[in-house]
Each structure stands twice: as structure tokens, then as C-alpha cells.
UniProtKB/Swiss-Prot annotation:
Record-linked Gene3D superfamilies: Oligoendopeptidase f, C-terminal domain (1.10.1370.20), Oligopeptidase f, N-terminal domain (1.20.140.70)
Source organism per UniProt: Mycoplasmopsis pulmonis (strain UAB CTIP) (Mycoplasma pulmonis)
Gene Ontology terms, MF aspect: metal ion binding; metalloendopeptidase activity
GO biological process, one term: proteolysis
Keywords: Hydrolase, Metal-binding, Metalloprotease, Protease, Zinc
Name of protein: Oligoendopeptidase F homolog
Family according to the record: Belongs to the peptidase M3B family.
Gene name in the database record: pepF
Amino acid sequence: MSKEIKEYKKYSDVPKEYRFDLDYLLEGKTIDQLFDQFLEKSKKLIKIKDSKYQNIESYLESLKLEEDFNLLNNKIINYISNNISVNVVDSHFREISQKFEFMYYSFFNQIGDENQRILEHEEKITKWLLDPRLASYKKALDFVFKSKKHRLSKEVEDYLIKVSRGNIELYKVYGILTNSELDYGYALSSDGKRKIEINLSNRFNLLKDQDENIRKTTYLNWNKASAKHKETLSSLLYQHFSKLSADALARGYSSTVNSFLFEDQVDEKLLKNLYDKVSSNKKVFQKYYQNYKKFFEKKNSKQMEAWDIYLPLVVVDEKYSIEEAQDLVLKSLEPMGSEYISKVKEAFSSRWVDYLPVKNKRSGAYSIGSTHGIDKKFILMNFDGTLNSVSTLSHEMGHSMHSYFSDKTQPQSLSSYPIFLAEIASIFNELMLKDYLLEVSENLETKFHILNESILNFVGTVHRQTLWSEYEYTLYNKIDKGEPVGTYTKIDEIYEQISQKYKVSDLKNHHPEDEKNVIGVNVPHFYYHFYVYKYAIGMIVANVFYQKYKEEGKQALEFYINKFLSAGGRDWPVEILKDAGIDLYDSKIYDLAFKNFEQTIDQFVEIGNKLFK
């Protein structure tokens, strides 16, 4: 294993093999030439926006033009966004991006309300759908017809489109307040030699610091700063929810939550199953927390406090080179079969991945979307040589391979998979890597670290996101009914009530010296239109697929690739999973997921008992 990852001052200094191959997207042309093609294709679509409904042949021809337009759009978006990601202050690509945004929105405004035109020709299109040439468009068109009952008058819809750029976006106000204007104070070391300003970027690293006073002052000062603005934060969240509630009820939805579920054609029963099964499995989560607390107190000879939960019990300083990380990912995924492995090797050799952190590069990691028609499913990361970075590479490769199999198997109109399904393949890859690393590692501390990270991932995704989702669900429903819940006191009361249902730790949420943690009004995800439950579902489903693989072997992997990875968006999410052997309305699927999770906890406890005596 390598000890250090070489640092580079400029992106251009990074070796070519560790950078994106973005010139591939241009195919020998310039970006301005692609813009010219974009304008040419957009003019054709605008010209035929009404005449294409004259007969089925004209309509089919227009759909082909739209697909060509979308393929070009994908290349342009991939080229611009990836270039900006590797240097977020690059003025050249920012200007290019602004130019394209203007072109795109100009097209969008001229093309107008396509759904309205579809509805005006509903009778005609319904007959055309009997033609097999329109089979791949049936899902989207049927959804437009089904959505008709939730549309307002043509004049109102036109007005809403025209004034949309003036909409107040409260999540942006929330972001400015919490990212820039809140003063979180300083973390102070026990000896007084370190004084570190607390911000969103360093908060969790400070909570992992070996110095208890750094952790304590980070925890308390963060909470105090947030609590100081609790009424402002409450007002922002309440107004955001109220706006969405008013819109949903005006459009004839039975509730705000059902307006969100409608987009994925999900029944509310799925939420009830999720909330009931996760909260009823509290004992499994408690098993982890009780043992973690025991190990912590044995190691540190002190009572565990709320600011101690992120302190690592073991320090794993193993470092991996990019090539070693690639090798680990390949070996862990070997059971996936020859096509899967061949494509991952191609991803590494053909420069799908931009690996190394440099100044002004976007933080975090992603596997890019809008990939149909593009062979390279680009991945950005900030590789630092840690086990976590190896896991990130495997995770993002899961997304990219999902895109590869979906794009290869499905027509363009059905190739894109929704957020509801997006995290399953990436988490599945993490589980493959976890078990491979446990198998080959001989170091107990490394194994303990791997298991703990996997458990925390499950807890953070399933337990926390489900709690948050039921809280959102409850708050939306109260606002729909007109209940007066617009103050911090009322909102916090709701959050505390839901928290008690899921409570697994006996640690205090706040300290006598401290203002209360106002988490119920201070989570950015609450501004993302009720989607955190999808993260929990993704983790549950990935664990079910993985448990099936452990019980059934390679046959389960072939089924997973053919029925899930290759499905794209060919059907609604629940139906795709049902076809892949997982019925989300059957509460028994949670038993399989928690079985796999509890096996991981058992391994964690077994090794922890050896390390902390």
C-alpha cells in the first residue's frame, strides 16, 4: 500500500490518466460548432411544434428529431458541467455555460407548454398509441393524460410559466443563512493552543478530533448559533411547506405528500410500511448503539457524550494508490460477470474518472447523469488514498454501470432511471466491496473500521432518513389541514414526537450548558420536495438484493443485472422492483434487509469484544 497521494497545484499538472477525457465529447468539433447544431435542431422543433400532430408519421418524425436534439444536449451538458466541476472559478467555461443557458431557455420559452398540446390532441394520440412504433413513448404520454386532472386552466398554466423566474426560492435563503451568515463560533482545544473557526465544511472533521474540548465546543457552539435563529429557520421551513401545500391542494391532490408520490406512481401504503418496519426494528439499531457505547467507554474510560458519537474508536491510516483502489474495486466486483468487469476496466483505462483533488475543484463525488448516447459515464471524485475513497470509487462506479446497462438496453425515452432507484446500484457495490475487504484483511482494527462505516451508512440512511421523512409527512399533513404550526415551538413539538418513536440512543440531544439542537428546522433536505424516504428505500432494497445474492449465489446477480440494472425507467419504480423480485408493498422485504444489517452488527460486536477488553 502506498503511503502518500501526490498533490498537484494546478489541474493541468495532474497526469492525463487521472483526468476526464472530455475532448471525446466534442468528436473533433468545437463547442461553438455544437452550439450551432443545437440552434439548428431547436429551430426545427419549434417550427413543427404544432404541425407534428397532423398525422402519426409527422409525429414519429418529430420524436426522432427530439431524440437527436436530446443526444446533442447530453453531450453539451456533460462537456460544460464536467469542465466547470474541475475548476469552479474558470471564467471561460462559466461564460460558455451562461451562453448555453440563455440558448436553452430561449428554446424552452419558444417551444411553450408541450403537455398542453399533447392534451389538446389526446383522442388522436390515444389511437396512435396502438401502433407498436410508439410503444416506448406510451409510459410518458399516459402519464400526461393521467396528470390532466391536476392541471389548471391553460391561461393560468401559461401565466405560471411566464412568472416562474420570479418565484421566491426559500431554499436559497436558507442556504445563504446557514452557509454564509450564521456565526458558529470557534472550536477550542484543551490546551488553548488551537482555535478553529467552525463552518459547514469542517464541522464533522472537528467532531472526529481526538481532543475532547474541540469536539465539545464544536457541538455546543454549533447548536447555540442555530438556536439563536430558530424562529427565522422555522418561518422559512413553514413558508416553504405552505407554498407547496397550497399548490398541491389547488391542483386537486388529496394531500401535498400525495402530489409528490404521484410523480413516481407510489401508493401511500409504501410510506406506512417504511415507517412501521423501521421504527419496529429499533432493537437492531439499539444493539449497535449499546455496543458502540460500551466499546467507547472501555477505550476512553469516560461516559460517552453527544459530541463523542463521531469519534473513531480505531484509527486506520492505511493508504491506497489509485491503481490499488482500482484493483480492489475490480476484485470485489468479480462475481458480477464478464461484461460488467470488462466495462469497469474500460472505465479505468478510457478515462471515465477524474480522481484527484486540486484547488478550485468541486468537492465530493458524482456519477454524471444525461448519459444516453455517451459511451463514457463520467465520474468525478476527490481521491485521498483512504478506504473511504476506495468505497467512493466503488459507489460511483455502481451509478455509472447502472447508466451503462440501462442506456444499452432501453430506448432513449425509457433509459433514464429516477431518483427513487438511483442509489440502489451504488450501495450494492459498497456491500460487495465491504465483504471483499473483510475477507482479505488480516487486521482486526481495519475490519472493525470497515464494519462500523457500513453500519453508520445504514443507520444514517435508513434510520435517520425514515425519521425525517415521517416528520415531513406529519408536518405537511398538519399544514394541509390548516393547523397553526408556524412557530418553532409547534414545529419542534412535532419533531420531538416523531423522534421518540425512533429513539435508539440514551444520549442526551443537548447538554445542560447548551441550547437545544434545532435539527427539526435545520436540515437542507427538508427543502427538496419530500424525497429523503427514497434514500431509505434505496438502502433497504440494496440490502435485499445483496442478501438474495448471499443466499442464492451468482444466479441472483444475473437476475439483478438483467431485471434491475438494465431496466432504466421502462416502468414505474415499484413495478421495476417487483419484476426484479422485490415487492415494496410486502413488509417481509424489510426482514431480509435487516437480516443482512444485523449480520454486520454481529461481526462488529464480535471484533469489538476482542479489541476492547
